Amino acid sequence: VATQTVLDAVRAAPTLLEAIRAADALTIAAVSDGGGRAVRLLTRAALDPSDQLTAIAAVHSLAQVFDEEADLALLRLLADERAFLREHAAWAFGGRLPRPAAVGPLLRMLRDGGFAGMLAQRTLLLWASSTPDLVALALEGALIGERDRDVRARYVETMGLVPGAIAERTLLHVAADEGEVFEARAAAADALGERPSDDAALMLARLGEMPEPLGPVARVALADRAIAPVADAGPTVAQLFVHADIDGTLTRVGAGDNGGIATLLVRLGDALTEEEGIDRVLTLSRGTWAEAERALADLPAAGHGFAPVPFVGAAVPMPQAWPRRTAAERGIRRILRAAGRVDVLHLRMADVGSLAAAAVARELEIPVVFTVAPDPHALIAGLDASGALSRADFGDRDAVEHFWFRVRLVQRLAADAAHTVLFPRAELAETMRDMLGIDITAHPERHSIVPEGIDVRLVERGEQAARAAAAGEDVALDAGDDLSALDALLAELPAERRGLPLLLSVGRLHRVKGMATLAEAWAGSPLRDRANLLLVGGDLDAPTPDETEQLDRIRTVAADGLLLAGHRPNGTVARWLGAVRHGRPGFAAAGGAYVCASVKEEFGIALLEALAAGLPVVAPATGGPATYVEEGVTGFLVDTTDHEALAVAACLALDLAAGPLAEFSADRGRTMVLERYTIEAMASALSGVYVRATADQEWPLRCDLVLGAS
């Protein structure tokens, strides 16, 4: 009876987010009722095509009813023609006892790869802990006759986490086979690094003598077997973003997924090492096996170090990276073990890196700080409110966007964190309660509001160089080179457009960042007659699928005055911000503005840099920018999905930049950033968070793991 009542409540929930949260009550009711009636009610709900959201909730509730009928229902769902039901059944089976009849369907999902393959792999590995031979023999059979190199690699990677002699025998065979594809041999070698046997050690030693590409993989795996932790390391903070190639020079910012988060982690890591009580920061990101090998040998005992997590194969966009969970977990574990001392791990988003890192942190008993943001909650709420997403198609969209999994991941990360960090935003407490179901007023000591920060000095130097160059004064060689590179781009403009100011937007070429939307708004309005548009970001030579989608849209509306600069280093962007304000003699007029057309912006590093450079800005009306953009004074807040509104706001920003209040606006923006949003202020606030996170653990910590302890 309770199951029926709560099912009705899930179906009647006024919003999609409220229905998702009500799913927990459905599981409790189903477990309480138990028996065939509850199973039949849930099965009917799972198969109801009119309410795909309730169907997903029913699948996960079924998994908690330990009844033979529930197993049979989940088996049926595992073979359903609808992808979202198969995915959630595969996920749900992980909470049940091993079911031999489900192994075949799960292997087929693993073969197909993608997000569903990751879920299937997870369930198979959960079962392998109690029935290793069942899973190992199934994988061994699947390898026979399989020719697809990526599929073979997935099977071998999965086998690598199955305990027992059967799995190790297969790994040794694959690693030794010179006729085997590289991807599978690499997966076998990587897994052998976690096997204690002498045979595994001998195999890795042999493979380690080989050149690239297999040699570095084997040598890194060998290092796994004999980790020599860094001695004498002081209090250490680890942070990560595994979708970017992050180095101290930020040479790849703006390409692929190397966005504002990469800039933030580099600047923040440098600033944190200046804080009392923090000796070392380790920033983990994507890298090659050769880079990982070098980094393991050279992890610093102090200062800001960079450590790559290696993956086999080319980089993939963040939404497609879920199948790299196993590799991410192994790479993160390797680095944190080699680091010797890690006092706290800071996670910032609900992605595969955080999923993997959280598992490693639990294993190594490292306290976690998690930055909580309403993502994907805000997107779900927006689509729900606009009618673009409903119960009728939630599952189909979920199969692409993984909404349910990401919502649950945020919930789990926030619940497990020793401390959570929040971005400032209007009505923060209400947003956290309504969207995430988190009451930050109940235990305020567990939450801290910490705004992001920027390297103001870098922006100031860039602005000063651009001002001097515009006045005909000499500037430093590197600044001159950057400004000359901008001139070369501007020289492509027709002569009649070289007297116009610039509208600048910096960011990844991704639909969330709205670069194509901005180009369309500019090209289809009088804004095009007012200014040229300069878009900075993306890999123009080897674009990712997301970048290609944006470039195709941009090129559809391309016209004289639109310039694509590709990704540029952070220092270059700082000088170009100054050039937008002060102009480039013979190429661009002074009095430009900055436009952020992001669909959502939790805070906005690039916006803060533009304000610090004295530019008026256009920014999304929702999220973080609303807390620092002063409407009509330092910029304009707008619905960035509305082309007309975006163009009008950009025109107003140009009016402000050229009007009598231009200097007042610039000073106001700069002062605001200096007072509230420096990277040093952010580091100071976070250092206090880290102290609290390591001091207030429920489990005992060794005294030398408490941040700041001697």
Give the label of every model feature segment.
Residues 2-46, 50-54, 63-74, 80-83, ...:
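Catalytic cores of nucleotide-sugar-dependent glycosyltransferases that transfer UDP/GDP/TDP-activated
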Residues 56, 87, 118-124:
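Sequence termini and other peripheral, non-core segments
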